[in-house]
Amino acid sequence: MRKNRLIIPALLTFLSMQGYAQELNDSITSGKPAKYSDEVVEIGYHKAQRLEESTSSISTVYNEDFNKRSAKNIANSLFGYGTGLTTLQGSGRYADAEPTFFIRGLQSLSTNNPLILVDGIERDITDVTPEEVETVTILKDAAAVAIYGHKGINGVVNITTKRGIYNTREIKFTYDHGFGWQARKPKFVDSYSYANAMNEALVNDGLTTRYTQDELNAFRSGQYPYLYANVDWLGETYRDMDATNIYNISFRGGASKFRYYAMANLTTNKGFIANPYMNDGYSTQDQYSRANLRTNLDIDLTEKTKLKLNVLGILSETRTPGADDQGGANLWDMIYTLPSAAFPARLENGTWGGSATWAGTKNPLAVSQAAAYTKFHERTLFADMTLTQDLSSITPGLGASGMLSYDNYAQYWENHSKTFVYGSNSVTAWENGVPSSTTYYTDGKESAMSSDAKCIAFTRVFNFA
C-alpha cells in the first residue's frame, strides 16, 4: 500500500527588538521614591517617624505637588491627593468653597470629620493658604492615630507650615489669575412649555385650565414680551465666568541660631452676578477678599533650648447681593421657584417686573441689582509658642516641651438694604387673537439705602500643653 507524505518546509528565525527605558534612579532600583526615602514626617506632639521605617498607614503630600493649582485654601488644593482621603466640594460659590474630608470612608454614626491640626494645634484648615504649607500628613489607621485617642477615631490631617532655613535668604513672589465656570447649570423650560404643562396638570386634577389658546400662542410667538414673558432667569441674573486673583510674597531664611519665614497673601474673587454696577457708588457683585499674614520664627536660645513662635493674622470680607436677616438674598431659590412665564424682568417703562400672583417670590434680577448688599467681615488671630528643652544629659532621648496658644476670632455683619418698585401688565380681554384690554399692577416703593451693623460672633481660646 502506497503512503503519501506531506512535507512542510519551515524557516526558523530570531527577531531582535531594542527597548528604551528611562534613566535609572534610586526609585527604580530600591522601589522607594528617591526624593523622600529618608523623609521624616511629624505625626503630632513633637513625635516624628521616618517613612521607610514606619509601619503605620501614613500618606504625605508635599507643597510642590498640591501647590500646582490656583486655590482659595489648602483644603481646596488637596483634591486628588493623599491616598485614603476623600474630598467633597459642597458649593460652587467661591466664598463657600470649603470642602468636607473623609479618611477611609465613613467611620462612625455621630461624626465623620477627621481631626485637623495646623502645626500640632487643632484649627480650621480653610484658614491656611497653600503657599504657606510645607507638607500635609494624613494619618489613617489605629497605629498612626493612637496618640490622639478618641479625637483621632476618624483619622488625622496634620498640616505643617513652612519654616526658615539656617544661613540662607530667599524672597519669592507669585501671582495667580484664575477663572471659574458654572459647569453644571440647570436647564429650565421656556414659557410656552411651562404654560402647556400647567394646563395639563390642572386638567389631570379635574380643574379648569389656566392659560387660553390665545395666551399659549402669545407665549410661543414671543410677540408680546411685556405681557407674556419668556425670561431666562438664570441667564439674566448670572454670567458664565468669575475671576480670581491671588498675590503672594514670602521671605525665608536665617542665621546660625535664628530662622524665619514670613508670608503675605492677598486673594480676591469677583463672582457670577451679571450686572452688578447698576447703582451709583457701590457694587452688588458676589465678592470675596482675604489677606493672610504669617510669621514663623525659630530661635536657638542655647544649644539645647529651642523656642518656636508662630503668628497668623487673617482679614476677610464677603459681599453678597440683596439684604436679609444676617445674610444675603438666596438668588438660586428665587430662580428655581420662578417660572419663565411669571412676568418680564423689566417692564417697557423700566420698572422691575413683579406680580401679585408671585408675590412670595421676588424678581431675582432686581434683587441682584437694586436691593443693595450684605457684608461679612472676619478678623482672626492665631498665635502659639513652643519651648523645647533637650535633657539628654540626664538620660539619652529625654526631653521636655511646653506649648501655649491663643486664638481670637470675631465676625461682623453689615446689612445695607434698599427697596424698589415693581409691577406688571395683565391682559383682561382678547379680540381676534390680539390683546384688547390690559390692567396695570404695581407694588413696592423706591427707598434710599439704609445700613445696619453689629458683631455677631466673638471667640477667644487659650490652649496649654
Outline where the language-model segments fall.
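Entry/capping segment at the start of metal-dependent catalytic domains
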Residues: P130
